[in-house]
Amino acid sequence: MSVDSKEPSSQEVKIEDESNASEDSEVKTASETKSKGKKISIQNLSPAEIIKTFEDAQLGKDLPDVYVGDTVRVGVRISEGNKERVQPYEGVVIAKRHGGIHQTITVRRIFQGIGVERIFLVHSPQVASIKVERRGKVRRAKLFYLRERVGKATRVKQRFDR
């Protein structure tokens, strides 16, 4: 890391460009870096505003509105050796938690007679796509009662207005 004679202010963060490994490597402040073609200035922002700006930049995916009770197909990226493929996982959304960049959905399906639930971080790079197959009509925020039900009792009524 090269030493700069000018000390950065208390709200500037030094970022070294690691792509150039020479001694005269360029030192940038975070206020000068660009994110997705936009220059972000953090000199007058509070730490909470800096975090919010970063999280908003990470939420770039175009994802459909997913509600509890919907049947969804989640494309999960799986890397096997040096290959990468997308494996679909289809089931009913039984819970939604958190919001923003930390949003998760719990998807339940029956596989070979056994109930399987997976929790997906919606904005994770491992989630390639989310497609809503059919909308569900439910009157609860969490559908954990479906765990005790078997067979046709686990069906959710279809909703046509969304």
UniProtKB/Swiss-Prot annotation:
Query: Which Gene Ontology molecular function entries are recorded, alphabetically?
Result: structural constituent of ribosome
Q: What SUPFAM superfamilies does the record tag this protein with?
A: Translation proteins SH3-like domain
Please give the GO cellular component terms listed in this UniProt entry. Answer: cytosolic large ribosomal subunit
One GO process term, biological-process aspect = translation
Annotated Pfam families: Ribosomal_L19 (PF01245)
Q: Does the keyword Ribosomal protein apply?
A: yes
Q: Where is this region: Disordered?
A: 1-40
Q: Ranges of Basic and acidic residues compositional bias?
A: 1-17, 25-35
Q: Which domain of life is it from?
A: Bacteria
**InterPro entries from the UniProt entry:** Ribosomal_bL19, Ribosomal_bL19_CS, Ribosomal_bL19_sf, Translation_prot_SH3-like_sf
Keyword annotations from UniProtKB, A to Z: Ribonucleoprotein, Ribosomal protein
**Protein's UniProt keywords contain Manganese:** no
Question: What is this protein's function?
Answer: This protein is located at the 30S-50S ribosomal subunit interface and may play a role in the structure and function of the aminoacyl-tRNA binding site.
Q: Hey, which family's this protein in?
A: Belongs to the bacterial ribosomal protein bL19 family.
This protein is called Large ribosomal subunit protein bL19
Lineage start:
Bacteria, Bacillati, Cyanobacteriota, Cyanophyceae, Synechococcales
